[in-house]
Amino acid sequence: MPNHDFLHSLNEQQQKAVLHTEGPLLLLAGAGTGKTKVLTSRIANIIHQNLASPQNILAVTFTNKAAKEMQERVHNLVSSYGLNIGTFHSMAARILRDQIEHLNLGLNSRFTIISQDDQLRLIKDIVKLKNIDTKKYAPKLIHIVISRWKDQGLLPNKLSSSDTNLPLQRVAKLVYEEYQQNLLISNVVDFGDLLLYNNELFIKNPDILKHYQERYRYILIDEYQDTNVVQYLWARMLASLSKNICCVGDDDQSIYGWRGAEVGNILRFEKDFLNATIIKLEQNYRSTLPILAAASNVINNNKNRHGKTLWTDKESGEKIKIISCWNDKEEARYIAAEIARLVREGRYSAGNIAILVRAGFQTRSFEEAFINSAMPYKIIGGLRFYERMEIRDVLAYIRIALNQNDNLALERIINVPKRAIGAVTLNKIKLYAIEKNISNFAAIKEMLEDGEIKTKSYETLKDLVTKISNWHERFSFDAPINVTKAILDDSGYLEMLQEEKTEEALGRIENINEMLRAIAEFNDIHDFIEHSSLVMENESLETSYGGSVTIMTLHGAKGLEFDVVFLPGWEEGVFPSQRSLDEEGEKGLEEERRIAYVGITRAKKELYITHAESRKIFYEIVRSYPSRFLAEIPEEIIIRTSSIKKYDSFYKF
């Protein structure tokens, strides 16, 4: 019998989901319905009933933060040593390292994972080598096309004529072939390769697939509505033997179609897994009745969805406030003043209030309004730690020390600090490497030995090669923190920053020191490199909101909650986005409506929705009309008003 500690705090539907232990289960979890609690209780129950050991359970999430939270919650319920909880990418990387030789690609288990920035740099190099017109075919667009193909599970040799109908696609295919070859030569992979190669591995090696099918007897996938094709295929293959797969998601919160997420994955679950059980979690523990009514009435206008209706046993709360403003500046002034009033009256702290915008261009007017009102605020969406220049530089030094075939890492650090290695010499090295089909580092070594480099760069390159070789050897016996400090000193990188003596340089040194603190927690430098790569790709919001109002996009707010939420810019063309309507038609409209649903359900107690009669978009004043989504909210739960002059004076703090 299950431990009833897992059940006593769960409602009836949540209990059903926890006690379901055999066969496929689709858990349709509406916003704020306690899905994480159900997931962790379900894992704990499986372990407690001895249906599987922790090592035989695989739980997959989209972010490191979610994986860590799930791990901690399960551990608080039962002993769960050996439980496999992680992101799609981390789990796929683990399998690939163990089985990479079976793919016969030339990769070995010490491959590194390159960042988005390095991916783009490589594509730019290929575009330049092939003399492709970057005005017609921007490298960023080519990168997007290649990434989308990988999300669909398509390697260059699997692209059909329908995949290359457009001129951009035909150019992207040429670049894609060269791009993959460069990755293999450098013994690196990108994030798209991790799952793509996993699926290739399973298809070509049924015995390996069976091994993992037998190992992972219970599979749980969180945020299933956000899976792309290659993630979906990976999960389906792993679960096809035991059929004990539990997919948790909410088709009404599928808002990442632009990056490859396929809402159809959750809609066709019953076809993929016959005799599947579907359980709906509809009791909301977050929001008030009017907020839930607004969300439900908006999303009910979507046709392609599993029907469900959120409800709560909370007493009715504040009505939804819909405010009409003269223009976008007045809208920002009104919101800043209203927030100031709520905080001044002691009803809410600034940290429990959020402004959620549809598009980045909307934030500037709020910055100005908050500066004028002396209201503390924070715009979420700046550079993350591992995306900062100095951190990427140090990571590149570590990568080239570990993997001397990593062309991208070498290219990044070869003149940082400045070493006077000119463009002519660099180009000569690249051409030599291409001709010999070897890495750039190997090319430098051969050219130095053969006297191919006779410029003043000779001594500099010889010194760099020696240092990289020494660092490589030292990593085999010394602690990662010690070797990294040596790299910073020997390379002159730290000295370069110290000599700048600017506030910016001091900030960069502080960041490097923080990075060293992170490295000190790892015994194996490869584990740190993999950790940093996965964090860069999946890093979720770690910000403490303190006493600042949060300004962020609706996409960024998914999974968060605030006492008070302001939703500005609810006008046709802004929200729903005109681009989505033009490019995707009805499909785009339904995704926009799901974004609206996500925004509404972030609010716990009060919700404000504003729209402007005119808006400045890209330097042009445009007449605006209220969003069609506003007409989908019942009048009986709305208070309509207009912004007025009194909000021109601000409460000071």
Swiss-Prot record:
Catalysis: reaction(s): Couples ATP hydrolysis with the unwinding of duplex DNA by translocating in the 3'-5' direction; ATP + H2O = ADP + phosphate + H(+)
Q: Where are the transmembrane segments?
A: none
GO annotation, cellular component aspect: cytosol; DNA helicase complex
Task: Give the signal sequence positions.
Answer: none
Q: Which UniProt keywords apply?
A: ATP-binding, DNA damage, DNA repair, DNA replication, DNA-binding, Helicase, Hydrolase, Isomerase, Nucleotide-binding
Could you tell me which Pfam families the record lists for this protein? UvrD-helicase, UvrD_C
GO BP terms, alphabetized = DNA replication; recombinational repair
Keyword match Isomerase: yes
Which CDD domains does this chain map to? DEXQc_UvrD, SF1_C_UvrD
A Gene Ontology molecular function term of the record: ATP binding
- List the InterPro entries hit by this protein, alphabetically: ATP-dep_DNA_helicase_PcrA (IPR005751), DExx_box_DNA_helicase_dom_sf (IPR013986), DNA_helicase_UvrD-like_C (IPR014017), DNA_helicase_UvrD/REP (IPR000212), P-loop_NTPase (IPR027417), UvrD-like_ATP-bd (IPR014016)
Give me the residues that bind ATP, please: 32-37, 286
**Can you tell which superkingdom this protein's organism belongs to?**
Bacteria
What PROSITE patterns does this protein's entry cite?
UVRD_HELICASE_ATP_BIND, UVRD_HELICASE_CTER
Location of the UvrD-like helicase C-terminal domain: 289-559
The family assignment reads: Belongs to the helicase family. UvrD subfamily.
Purpose: Has both ATPase and helicase activities. Unwinds DNA duplexes with 3' to 5' polarity with respect to the bound strand and initiates unwinding most effectively when a single-stranded region is present. Involved in the post-incision events of nucleotide excision repair and methyl-directed mismatch repair.
- Protein name (database record): Probable DNA helicase II homolog
Which organism is this entry from? Answer: Rickettsia bellii (strain RML369-C)
Name of encoding gene? uvrD
